[in-house]
Protein backbone atom coordinates (compact mmCIF):
# COMPACT_ATOMS: atom_id res chain seq x y z
CA UNK A 1 0.00 0.00 0.00
CA UNK A 2 1.31 3.46 -0.86
CA UNK A 3 1.97 5.52 2.29
CA UNK A 4 3.35 8.66 0.67
CA UNK A 5 4.57 10.33 -2.51
CA UNK A 6 7.09 13.12 -2.84
CA UNK A 7 8.66 14.95 -5.76
CA UNK A 8 11.22 17.74 -5.94
CA UNK A 9 13.02 19.69 -8.67
CA UNK A 10 16.33 21.53 -8.16
CA UNK A 11 17.95 24.06 -10.48
CA UNK A 12 21.51 22.69 -10.79
CA UNK A 13 23.16 26.09 -11.41
CA UNK A 14 21.36 27.66 -8.45
CA UNK A 15 22.37 24.72 -6.25
CA UNK A 16 26.00 25.12 -7.41
CA UNK A 17 25.96 28.84 -6.54
CA UNK A 18 24.52 28.09 -3.09
CA UNK A 19 27.19 25.45 -2.46
CA UNK A 20 29.92 27.87 -3.57
CA UNK A 21 28.62 30.73 -1.39
CA UNK A 22 28.10 28.50 1.65
CA UNK A 23 31.14 26.22 2.18
CA UNK A 24 29.42 24.23 4.95
CA UNK A 25 26.38 23.39 2.83
CA UNK A 26 27.66 20.21 1.16
CA UNK A 27 28.98 18.66 4.42
CA UNK A 28 25.69 19.52 6.14
CA UNK A 29 23.47 18.01 3.42
CA UNK A 30 25.43 14.95 2.34
CA UNK A 31 27.06 11.86 3.79
CA UNK A 32 30.84 11.57 3.27
CA UNK A 33 30.42 9.10 0.39
CA UNK A 34 28.14 11.54 -1.47
CA UNK A 35 30.26 14.69 -1.15
CA UNK A 36 32.74 14.06 -3.98
CA UNK A 37 30.05 13.59 -6.63
CA UNK A 38 29.57 16.11 -9.47
CA UNK A 39 27.28 19.06 -8.76
CA UNK A 40 24.46 17.71 -10.94
CA UNK A 41 24.51 14.46 -8.93
CA UNK A 42 24.52 16.36 -5.63
CA UNK A 43 21.56 18.42 -6.84
CA UNK A 44 19.69 15.22 -7.73
CA UNK A 45 20.46 13.76 -4.30
CA UNK A 46 19.25 16.94 -2.61
CA UNK A 47 16.03 16.69 -4.63
CA UNK A 48 15.76 13.05 -3.54
CA UNK A 49 16.11 13.95 0.13
CA UNK A 50 13.52 16.72 -0.20
CA UNK A 51 11.17 14.30 -1.97
CA UNK A 52 11.62 11.73 0.81
CA UNK A 53 10.77 14.33 3.45
CA UNK A 54 7.60 15.15 1.52
CA UNK A 55 6.70 11.46 1.13
CA UNK A 56 7.07 11.04 4.90
CA UNK A 57 4.73 13.94 5.57
CA UNK A 58 7.31 16.66 6.16
CA UNK A 59 8.82 15.55 9.46
CA UNK A 60 10.75 18.18 11.34
CA UNK A 61 13.86 17.59 13.39
CA UNK A 62 15.60 15.35 10.89
CA UNK A 63 19.25 15.47 9.99
CA UNK A 64 20.19 15.48 6.32
CA UNK A 65 22.84 12.96 7.36
CA UNK A 66 20.02 10.53 8.29
CA UNK A 67 19.40 10.00 4.55
CA UNK A 68 22.00 8.78 2.10
CA UNK A 69 21.40 7.97 -1.55
CA UNK A 70 23.28 4.83 -2.57
CA UNK A 71 23.39 2.80 -5.77
CA UNK A 72 23.13 -0.98 -6.06
CA UNK A 73 25.24 -3.22 -8.32
CA UNK A 74 23.00 -2.30 -11.27
CA UNK A 75 23.28 1.45 -10.63
CA UNK A 76 19.74 1.80 -9.31
CA UNK A 77 19.39 4.43 -6.56
CA UNK A 78 17.93 3.79 -3.13
CA UNK A 79 18.06 5.29 0.35
CA UNK A 80 19.94 4.22 3.43
CA UNK A 81 18.12 5.85 6.33
CA UNK A 82 18.84 6.11 10.03
CA UNK A 83 18.12 8.30 13.03
CA UNK A 84 14.98 10.43 12.95
CA UNK A 85 14.18 9.52 9.34
CA UNK A 86 14.11 5.81 10.20
CA UNK A 87 11.98 6.50 13.28
CA UNK A 88 9.45 8.60 11.34
CA UNK A 89 9.29 6.00 8.56
CA UNK A 90 8.66 3.22 11.10
CA UNK A 91 6.03 5.27 12.95
CA UNK A 92 4.19 5.83 9.66
CA UNK A 93 4.34 2.13 8.78
CA UNK A 94 6.79 2.58 5.90
CA UNK A 95 8.50 -0.67 4.97
CA UNK A 96 9.86 0.23 1.54
CA UNK A 97 11.09 3.40 -0.16
CA UNK A 98 11.26 3.70 -3.96
CA UNK A 99 13.45 6.38 -5.55
CA UNK A 100 13.89 7.67 -9.09
CA UNK A 101 16.25 10.54 -9.96
CA UNK A 102 17.23 12.35 -13.14
CA UNK A 103 19.13 15.43 -14.25
CA UNK A 104 18.88 17.12 -17.64
CA UNK A 105 18.68 20.62 -19.11
CA UNK A 106 19.97 22.20 -15.91
CA UNK A 107 17.37 20.60 -13.64
CA UNK A 108 17.60 17.69 -11.20
CA UNK A 109 14.42 15.82 -10.35
CA UNK A 110 13.56 13.13 -7.83
CA UNK A 111 10.41 11.12 -7.20
CA UNK A 112 9.85 9.04 -4.05
CA UNK A 113 7.10 6.57 -3.20
CA UNK A 114 6.87 5.04 0.27
CA UNK A 115 5.05 1.76 0.84
CA UNK A 116 3.79 -0.03 3.91
CA UNK A 117 1.36 -2.67 5.09
CA UNK A 118 -2.18 -2.09 6.27
CA UNK A 119 -4.51 0.89 6.19
Swiss-Prot record:
**Cofactor needs:** Mg(2+)
Q: Cellular component per GO?
A: cytoplasm
Please write the reaction equations for the catalytic activity of this protein. Answer: apo-[ACP] + CoA = holo-[ACP] + adenosine 3',5'-bisphosphate + H(+)
Single biological process term from Gene Ontology: fatty acid biosynthetic process
What top-level class of enzyme does the UniProt entry assign?
transferase
Compartments annotated for it: namely: Cytoplasm
- Its domain of life reads Bacteria
- Keywords attached to this entry: Cytoplasm, Fatty acid biosynthesis, Fatty acid metabolism, Lipid biosynthesis, Lipid metabolism, Magnesium, Metal-binding, Transferase
Identify the residues that bind Mg(2+): 8, 50
UniProt GO MF annotations: holo-[acyl-carrier-protein] synthase activity; magnesium ion binding
Residue ranges annotated as coiled coil are none
Question: Which Enzyme Commission number(s) are listed?
Answer: 2.7.8.7
Report the family membership: Belongs to the P-Pant transferase superfamily. AcpS family.
Q: Report the protein's function.
A: Transfers the 4'-phosphopantetheine moiety from coenzyme A to a Ser of acyl-carrier-protein.
Q: What is this protein called?
A: Holo-[acyl-carrier-protein] synthase
Organism field: Clavibacter sepedonicus
